[in-house]
Amino acid sequence: RPQIQVYSRHPPENGKPNILNCYVTQFHPPQIEIQMLKNGEIIPKVEMSDLSFSKDWSFYILAHTEFTPTETDQYACRVNHVSMDKPMTVNW
């Protein structure tokens, strides 16, 4: 089943623009659904890297979006894959 890591590109500072990454690894087959969320709502503008595969033929992909952290906003990454019973959400 997929492994999910959510992290910012730069050390987070409230009010300072940053990039939020959702790195998903160890999945097969390659079809996967990745959504990034702000306060539970889907962020519409998310960019995806090309799908790549590791030596063991499992796949990995990076989703990322621009964001500006604040004290109150909650960010997360939600992943759905055929190997999972239900989507998994990982909070930042």
From Swiss-Prot:
Keywords: Disulfide bond, Immunity, Immunoglobulin domain, MHC I, Secreted
Domain Ig-like C1-type residue range list: 2-89
GO biological process: antigen processing and presentation of peptide antigen via MHC class I; immune response
Record flagged with keyword Secreted: yes
Cysteine pairings via disulfide bonds: 22-77
Protein's cellular compartments: Secreted
Pfam families: C1-set
Record carries keyword Disulfide bond: yes
Annotated transmembrane regions: none
Cellular compartments per GO CC: extracellular region; MHC class I protein complex
Primary localization class, coarse: secreted
Function: Component of the class I major histocompatibility complex (MHC). Involved in the presentation of peptide antigens to the immune system.
Subunit structure: Heterodimer of an alpha chain and a beta chain. Beta-2-microglobulin is the beta-chain of major histocompatibility complex class I molecules.
Family: Belongs to the beta-2-microglobulin family.
Protein name in UniProt: Beta-2-microglobulin
Organism of provenance: Mus spretus
Gene, per the UniProt record: B2m
